[in-house]
Amino acid sequence: MRAMRPVAHLARCFCASSSVKETRPSIQAIAELRKALPGTSMLKAREALTASRSPDAPDTDNVEAAIAWLEQTRASDGAKREAKVASRVTAEGTIGLCTLSDGISSPGARAAMVELNCETDFVARNDIFGALARDIAHTAAWFPIVAASETSAVLSDVDVAAFLECPIIPFEASEENKHDVISVRAAITSVVARLGEKVALGRVASLAPTSGGSHGSALVCGSFAHGTASAPPAPQTPVAATFASGRVASLLAVQVHGPLSQRIMSRTATTQHNDHDHDRNGDDERKRQLRALARSLARQAAGFPTTSVDAPSATAAVASDASSETSGALLTQPFVMLLPAAGLDPSVNEQKSVRDALELWSNTYAGQADGIRVAALRRWEVGETAARPSDETSFADQVKEAAGLA
């Protein structure tokens, strides 16, 4: 009788082991699920595949059902987590810039800038957080209609509450993210569930392609981001849009008037026949110079504490010129960020203000004194609008204090 016990024990172990092997999700299904939802852990992928199996096929993996289960679980967990961390301060994060068209390569400038906040710099450097900022900025660039429609402003601040309900448009469209469309709010909630910190969309600005142009003029945008903590994952499929992020960023609209806009902003500027190669090459060179000028202006706005395009009055302009090192008006600042590719003499950035340099560039390349002007700009820094109670420390401060770094 005692001799039979080891045999029975082995039989039970064999049956249990066989049962576990039959119900364990396959490596292929786990890999497919993690590819569809980057950042999903092995344990969470296995749990999702097991929990989403059909009663009629308890041993069959269903990746689509697992994706739906994960999204539903994250939405529920994220909502609970959001309620728990709602009172926390989000003074860290990143500012994302997405440009669909700069108005030079193709007519109609279209771009957006967003500030996505979190509690700690650690999360701000996370790839999942960076990818979310990229997708939200891309969505904002596609949705200028949510900006205030009763204004003729070239660059508009978007109502964040309305924007959160928009369907998110992934920066990289692929087969892996073809599952159910979700809103910007839901995408943020999902990331809260995955990262465990409060994540909030601070502000959104969008450049509408039809708002700045008028007869005989064209709109060009320039952008620049500085102090990038971590770049989001590179897209696996080619995309026409560009993205940049950083702790300080600027987005501005440049309006081009006169012969220059008619020559190089038309749809036919780059589609001339071979007998016009000389003119086409000249137009291409002018485009490169204009793009470099717009880039220089964006660098200038980001590099200085810029708050406006120009001083509000002539008296203020004189005062700003007298102390241009701290001037908040872009046009009164010394143009120290001017790139050589813009086509002006390098000494210009040491001798002239931005206003003088633009006038010189207009006379040289645009064919008229007022051929180019800065129509609007935004310059943001991470956390500058964060409200913190005077008697409360942030989660980031608590972490630093616990680590002895405060």
From Swiss-Prot:
Compartments where found: Mitochondrion
Gene Ontology biological-process entries: mitochondrial translational elongation
GO CC, any one term: mitochondrion
Pfam families: EF_TS
Family: Belongs to the EF-Ts family.
Disulfide-bonded cysteines: none
Keyword Protein biosynthesis set for record: yes
InterPro entries tied to this protein: EF-Ts_dimer_sf, Transl_elong_EFTs/EF1B, Transl_elong_EFTs/EF1B_dimer, Transl_elong_Ts_CS
Region (Disordered) location: 387-406
Note: This protein may be expected to contain an N-terminal transit peptide but none has been predicted.
Role, per record: Associates with the EF-Tu.GDP complex and induces the exchange of GDP to GTP. It remains bound to the aminoacyl-tRNA.EF-Tu.GTP complex up to the GTP hydrolysis stage on the ribosome.
Swiss-Prot/TrEMBL keywords: Elongation factor, Mitochondrion, Protein biosynthesis
Stated name of the protein: Elongation factor Ts, mitochondrial
Any one GO molecular function term: translation elongation factor activity
Organism: Malassezia globosa (strain ATCC MYA-4612 / CBS 7966)
Gene3D superfamilies with a match to the protein in the record: DNA helicase RuvA subunit, C-terminal domain, Elongation factor Ts, dimerisation domain
